């Protein structure tokens, strides 16, 4: 028996904070954009299928970064692809979150030692909120990572002062040319 089933009388009052209402709305309508680069993308597609039914969690995949609040990076990120990852990340509206899926996007995977062209983790170019380990991770692991993102959203504070909000935005900003040059120098290319 829920609130709407019981009927609303004239003298009922519902008390909560604005943070709780807004966070509940955001975590109940999470719109991820998948950035599938390798075999992890197959597992991401399997997770989006009817067997796992992500829509029961309020998760509805989008294909445009301007409509997404979560980027799922799934697979090997090369130096050339890093620029596109940064560009898509910058096109997403705030608040935005990143989930790194699989060992290739987490740390370079099996290519990290001898692959001069492979980024040694997507967290070197954009801030990552949740890492999902595995090669490739099972759909259950991805769902667990998505639920971790929802927990992060649940605990967020919306009513920050302007100075705190600007500081938070500055921490998440990315200079693509600096990052690409730094990675190329580290790889010796």
From Swiss-Prot:
Its cofactor is [4Fe-4S] cluster. GO terms for molecular function: 4 iron, 4 sulfur cluster binding; iron ion binding; NADH dehydrogenase (ubiquinone) activity; NADH:ubiquinone reductase (non-electrogenic) activity; quinone binding. Binds 1 [4Fe-4S] cluster. GO terms for cellular component: plasma membrane; respiratory chain complex I. One of its GO terms (biological process) is electron transport coupled proton transport. Its EC number is 7.1.1.-. Belongs to the complex I 20 kDa subunit family. NDH-1 is composed of 14 different subunits. Subunits NuoB, C, D, E, F, and G constitute the peripheral sector of the complex. This is NADH-quinone oxidoreductase subunit B. It comes from Pelodictyon phaeoclathratiforme (strain DSM 5477 / BU-1). The lineage of its organism: Bacteria, Pseudomonadati, Chlorobiota, Chlorobiia, Chlorobiales.
